[in-house]
Amino acid sequence: MQTRNAFSCIKEGITRSISISIMIYIIIRAPISNAYPIFAQQGYENPREATGRIVCANCHLANKPVDIEVPQAVLPDTVFEAVVRIPYDMQVKQVLANGKKGALNVGAVLILPEGFELAPPDRISPEIKEKIGNLSFQNYRPTKKNILVVGPVPGQKYKEITFPILSPDPTTKRDVHFLKYPIYVGGNRGRGQIYLDGSKSNNNVYNATAAGMVKKIIRKEKGGYEITIVDALDGREVIDIIPPGPELLVSEGESIKLDQPLTSNPNVGGFGQGDAEIVLQDPLRVQGLLFFFASIILAQIFLVLKKKQFEKVQLSEMNF
């Protein structure tokens, strides 16, 4: 009996330990996987500044292209595709946080007009679902359903990102009208150069903080360098810390200037933004236009028939 109780206690303890470990893993893992959206969402209420600049450019300093494709016009309460393309050289590798080289990831933010939002799963067609793949979209804010973010995701698989969008219906949403609306997009490939607190990442150039001579370079055990510079003005020693990743450009005994690059620029990615326009079309206007075209065609047909009838009458009178 005592043996059975002891076994039950051990079993219960193991089960509890496993459960706690799983919970800790989930809590720690979640922020890492959602790092790209969280950086922007935590720091900025709106991803697009008053100047039109998307805030992702504050961390991703290099300028790269991005393209968006949307229909010219859509009807109310209709699901359509907004395709964002983030091109880059598939052969290049980026510097990871640990200093090693790895594949690039991509991310995007899509700023839709008020009323437009992510389409619900039951409204998305199988064809669009196939294009979406395993992508997971989220709202920039719970109250801003018209601003969507995605990433980071593997760039080799998702250089082209398809957003399923549901257009609003002005008959049910009084603040939406049948007009032409702008759509804004921002897309990045690779890691940023600046963190949200303003500090540099290891995906950046590191410059000398003093002018003088490089006295000593110590290679750290976990990667990176510690560079000692003797200041040319007062002879004091200045230590610059280089994280793992960037390649060193200077050597011991070399004279350097203030702000001279100590490392190469490891960044191979960058950020770009673009825009497009879409018309929320009134179905009655479309029907009226079709009716107008149909009436013109019928008028042309009747005119031709009348002309032929008139020619027959003239011909019969001449023969008479």
Swiss-Prot record:
Gene behind this protein: petA
Subcellular localization, as worded in the UniProt entry: Plastid, Chloroplast thylakoid membrane
Sites where the protein binds heme: Y36, C56, C59, H60
Protein's job: Component of the cytochrome b6-f complex, which mediates electron transfer between photosystem II (PSII) and photosystem I (PSI), cyclic electron flow around PSI, and state transitions.
Keyword list, A-Z: Chloroplast, Electron transport, Heme, Iron, Membrane, Metal-binding, Photosynthesis, Plastid, Signal, Thylakoid, Transmembrane, Transmembrane helix, Transport
Domain of life: Eukaryota
Gene3D superfamilies, per the entry: 2.40.50.100, Cytochrome f large domain, Single helix bin
Bilayer topology annotation: Single-pass membrane protein
Signal peptide limits: 1-35
Oligomeric form and interacting partners: The 4 large subunits of the cytochrome b6-f complex are cytochrome b6, subunit IV (17 kDa polypeptide, petD), cytochrome f and the Rieske protein, while the 4 small subunits are PetG, PetL, PetM and PetN. The complex functions as a dimer.
GO cellular component: chloroplast thylakoid membrane
Pfam families cross-referenced by the UniProt entry: Apocytochr_F_C, Apocytochr_F_N
Membrane spanning stretches: 286-305
Similarity comment text for this entry: Belongs to the cytochrome f family.
GO BP terms in the entry: photosynthesis
Cofactor(s), names only, from the UniProt record: heme
Cofactor note: Binds 1 heme group covalently.
Keyword hit for Metal-binding: yes
GO molecular function ontology, one term from the record: iron ion binding
Name of the molecule in the record: Cytochrome f
